[in-house]
Amino acid sequence: MRLKEKDRRSLDNSVISIPNLRLKTILDTLEDVEEVWYAIDLSAFSSKKTLFDYQKNALENAIKGLYYFYSKCGGNKEEFFENVYKGILPETLPIRNKKLIDLLKEEGFVVDENKLPTYQIINRMGFWMATGSGKTLVIVKLVELLSGLMNLKVIPQKDILFLTHRDDLIGQFKGHVKEFNEGRMPSKIIQLYELKDYEDVKSGLDNPTGIPVFYYRADLFDTEEKEKRVNFRNYLNNGNWYLILDEAHKGDKDESKRQTIFNILCKNGFRFDFSATFTEEIDFITCAYNFNLAEFVKQGYGKHIYVSGENLRSFNRRDDFSQEEKQKILLKIFILLTGIIKAREKVKDRVHYHKPLLLVLVNSVSVDDSDMELFFRGLVNIAKGQIQDSDFQGAKDELIQELKNANFRFENVRLSREFLNLLREITFEDLLESVFNSKSPGTIEVVQIPQNRQELLFKLKSGDKPFALMKIGDITPWLRKKLEGYEIVERFEEENIFAKLNEDEDINILMGSRAFYEGWDSNRPNVIAFINIGMGEDAKKFVLQSIGRGVRIEPFKNIRRRLEILHKNSQIDKETYQQVKDWTTPIESLFVFGTKASNLETILQTLAEQTEEEETLGDLFEINPEVQGKLLLVPEYKESELILRMHPEDKEIAREFLELDDRILVCMFDVHPKVLIKLRNNLDALVHAEHQERKIGIPEAVLKRLFGYFSVKFR
């Protein structure tokens, strides 16, 4: 049930296909949502975490979407389609696969002449959120929201199912749920069950006291049972699922069948899609909230992105390029990395940035003349010092000339004159010390970790610390064929270098295949080189996910916004900012290199499609004229009481009902007696009456919000 992809014009004509986010456009302007729908606290997550504004905005649009579907349209899919999507989405979707047609008809869908009326699968909304934006926290809060709205009887009672396509993502979800549950009353915690336990839970053998949520691997759903694969019919639940999908697309030959199964599972429920890489037109049109890579970067949560005009075509094994050409491009990349490392050295006493890293992602690893092998050969030659001074100077001059007028994606950013001058002063000895951890050239030595079949370390014999890590599926072919003649030593003190790469500042280069990069989170990448990644939708998704994982920034512990934004928000003092500002842009940037023109266009196209409208960074932020030119100090924090803002009438409702007997309130709301004591003794200090706050007016909803907020906050 894929919509036909619209033809896209060439970037050469400067025409970019901007997705139509129809549902988001409507929800952003929807203002008549009844107050009861906002009865839960959207910001509280745990004693250590609260949601960013953009995460709360995602939940607010989830509320608006559910309100529109269930309250304004009465849960009627045809009415929802007519009101929101008529004339935007086609009335019917063609289905050419007879097995899918039979499957849909079997489960009660109407399919006429191989066409499915679109309204039948329109009970859905998507959340287009960048890798690294914390969408898992939003998913956990969405579970709490659904439970709260079901308890208030404003949406139907249904079971909740969470699906994602990898075990590590399930593990990540479990970890966030565990943190969310800490300190909550039993009825408020989320209880996770593997989907195979569904019958036990529903039959009462395992009786949950909290919010039951089922989970499973999305890619293991099928039409028959086999090993870990499950027959979806055994968990059909009459289509009454609130189905939450997190990156639940694998892109293989069974994708269409799985998407059909997902639509069947939520036929009488609702579907929530979370992804950093939407590609189908229906995903964009039904998108309720957008905080994609472009928004993530523009609002200062990620690094600036620069896509180099330099062409890595010399690493295409099918073409005959000279060793000098390979050497020049590697020199440019290494000089750039050296410059960023040196910039970080200048500010690290004041701002605790990551250690910059070069990430090399290749398509082939072990075949003859593989992408990895060609890159490694070039690395070896430079490490040995087999370059002419004129070649080094030429590479440096070309790099500086390119960076002088560098056009960063999404923003109007320029590298400082100070940084460009620093690049001019870099010597080959600086490069050896910064990149290769050595003061002089040398031959490469291979460091193997016994029992570790996926990692190899590389160091220069002239140095004392490894400088590079290779992470691939199996190192055996490399040891046997590619590294013949190299000295191989064994290292016993570490079993998994990759797992500790964020803390290990010695490693400056990470080389890996496409497969290894899934699920890796790090602030460290400043340069990414894609070598022969291919083209098409799969390559675009990989590029987007890779760049998304490389843009994370954390100048101070647990503060994940760029320094300029922190300065404008008065989170650092003016003196500190003035001392480091000339060096921050390269450290807060991700420089992307691609193999050849077609690959580079894939990257450009992917990034261009992330932009809804033309904006510059200056358009997004305003400096308060009252504070311009004045000293902005770093605030010092002290413990203070928590404050909940409520409409005055809601506060009076709370005051009145707090006079009820403890046993009644504990029984009705599962609130801890200590919370009741705290609220009775300090209500005026803890709850501020403000007329601009939404009025709820329903005692049950007011008390749920009050107790929910302070039950989490009081430790």
Enumerate the predicted regions with their spans.
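Histidine-centered active-site/metal-ligand motif
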Residues: Q55, H165, H249-K250
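Conserved SF1/SF2 helicase motif Ia
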Residues: R124-G126, A130, V138-L169, F173
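Active-site-adjacent bridging/hinge elements
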Residues: K24-I40, L100-Q120, I139, H304-G309, ...
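Conserved glycine(s) of the Walker
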Residues: G134
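Conserved pre-motif I regulatory segment
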Residues: L27-W128
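Helicase-associated low-complexity regulatory tails and linkers flanking the ATPase motor
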Residues: M1-R9, F45, E60, Y70, ...
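Accessory nucleic-acid engagement/destabilization modules that flank
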Residues: M1-W37, A44, T50, I122, ...
